[in-house]
Amino acid sequence: MKRSHKDYLEDIAEAIELIEEFTREICFEDFLCDKKTQFAVIRALEIIGEASKNIPNDFKRLHPEIPWREMARMRDKLIHAYFGVDVRVLWKTVKEDIPSLKGKFEKLRK
């Protein structure tokens, strides 16, 4: 069955929630030592990026407040440079970009 853009939007929203859940009660030092959480966050970011690539361009143009291109680029960096992921950049994404993205998605889904 073909998936709709709403399915992909749900995938993104769910991945955002999971990232927040995985990192809710840890500090950077704990994150730095926790390979399982790093791996889970990376996977969720890959899902966000992959789902964003499947959103129709017409829909993306209607919602320029969402960083579609950046989401896809992050996925590409994680997939193709998995051995060189900078954990500091990953943490900054989790703590700064994900909350902002969540707010934008909440508005979009209303």
Curated annotation (Swiss-Prot):
Gene Ontology MF term list: nucleotide binding; RNA nuclease activity
GO CC entries: toxin-antitoxin complex
Transmembrane segments: none
Disulphide bridges, residue numbers: none
EC number: 3.1.-.-
Keywords carried by this UniProt record: Hydrolase, Nuclease, Nucleotide-binding, Phosphoprotein, Toxin-antitoxin system
Residue(s) carrying O-di-AMP-tyrosine: 82
Active site per UniProt: 75, 80
Motif (RX(4)HXY motif): 75-82
Superkingdom of origin: Archaea
Modifications the protein undergoes after translation, according to the UniProt entry: Modified by cognate antitoxin MntA; probably at least 2 successive AMPylation events occur on Tyr-82.
EC top class, as a word: hydrolase
PANTHER family assigned: RNASE MJ1380-RELATED, UPF0331 PROTEIN MJ0127
Role: Toxic component of a type VII toxin-antitoxin (TA) system. Overexpression in E.coli inhibits cell growth. Neutralized by cognate antitoxin MntA. Neutralization is probably due to AMPylation by MntA. Probably an RNAase.
Family as reported in the entry's similarity comment: Belongs to the HepT RNase toxin family.
Designated name of the protein: Probable ribonuclease HepT
The species this protein was found in: Thermococcus cleftensis (strain DSM 27260 / KACC 17922 / CL1)
Taxonomic classification: Archaea, Methanobacteriati, Methanobacteriota, Thermococci, Thermococcales
Name of the coding gene: hepT
